[in-house]
Structures are given as C-alpha cells and as structure tokens.
C-alpha cells in the first residue's frame, strides 16, 4: 500500500503512535495533504474569520481550528448521521468534500499502519469517542503541546520567528508576514503591509515568538505564511528543525543554521541530551520506508 501523504507526514504519524496521540496526528497529516476545507465567501469574510477563530477554542493555532472542526463534524456524522453532519458543515462555511477527503485519507493511513503490524486493528465499536486506532494509542490525544510538537516535526523546516510588530523571519526569508486568513494575523490586512503608521503587535506576538506554518506564497505585498500555530521555544528547538551547532561557550544552540537559542549556563547540555533521547525514537532511524 502506498502512503497517501508525503514521507515527512508519514513519519509524523508514526510519532503519533509512539507518543500515543494517534488520532489527532492522523487527522492533521490528512489536513496537510489536502486543501483547506474552510470556505471564505467574498460576502461573508468576517463571519468566516470568526468561525475559524471560534473553532480554535482559544488556542493561537489554525491547525487546531481545523482539527477541532473536523473532529466535531466526524462526531456529528457518527452520532446523528451524514445529513446532520453536512448541515453542520454548511452552517459553518466548510466544504463537505474536503472533510470527506480528510476522512478517507486518515482511514487509509490507519489501514496502512495495521497492514504493517505497527498498530492493532480495532473495530469502530471499541474506539473511544470515535477516535481512530486503539484507545491505548490515544491516551495523550488531548495534550495540545505534544500534538503541536509532533506537527512541528512533520512540517519542519517551516519555522518562523517574530522580529517586529508585523514581520517574521524564516530560514529562507528575512521578511515574511502572517497571511490575513490566519487567526494569528491580529487583524492585519494586505493593505497594512508597508504602511508607515505605527502598529500594535499585529502578528503572532512580541519579537521572539515562534510559529510553525504549513505553506508560504509570494504576493504583491511580500511573503505570506499560511496556516500558522504559535509554539514554545523548546518545541521549536527539539522538533521543528535540525540542531546544527553544538554547545559553545556562549551556551547558544542553533536550529537549521539560522535560529539561535540562548540558555543559562549549564542548561544547553541538558537540552542536547533531551534532544538525543527524542532522536532515539525518530522514525527516520527505522529500517523501512514510509
């Protein structure tokens, strides 16, 4: 069976099984492999943005907005039927075909894991709350920082750092901007870019804030980052890139040769040891292809 997702996302799914948050990782891998199912009708942009923000349940994460929306659609579909689920999708400006594609892809990946004897085949009647896979492999599915950490590994090296009220830096772009469709844009519109007026922190937060992003594209206003989530420094250091430099006298660790992390004296070696422990369960070290 051929994997329906790219290798990096396939390895992320294996990490989801290892760290026992399989269901959300299967869904997020499927979401990343398809176009967004959130609709943005020109005559209802404000409502579309409000829906997406509400779906995030207070988290600064477009990825969690999509994850929560899909899981609610799935729950309604299983409990009340397809018509009720589709009504939920229509009323919340979601594309039913996109949701169905995510369902199909996530089930295909689960079947692949079962076929490879990596997870047990659990009938739907024994699954908890309609989650995919063995309940034992989902005991951490509600641990949001863990889920975002594993997502960071699947999206690597898509990491950005806030450098000014509007601008961010990525590994290849000295200046980038959060796309207005993201819940982390802070109300920034494309016309605001390049404005001479002073801004509050319209981006993700103050300088130093880290984000992971799904895609980026070049528009007339610059480089825009789409589907973003704020992550913590340790998540960025351990999962969102490769540690390129070892501890030096300044106690600075650098990710992907561009993003430095400075630690108090004696802390950096402990972080390196922790990273090595995580690397020991990295699916990249396994002896089969994904």
Stretches with model-predicted labels:
Residues 1-257:
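Second RecA-like catalytic domain
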Residues 177, 260-290:
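Charged, non-catalytic accessory extensions
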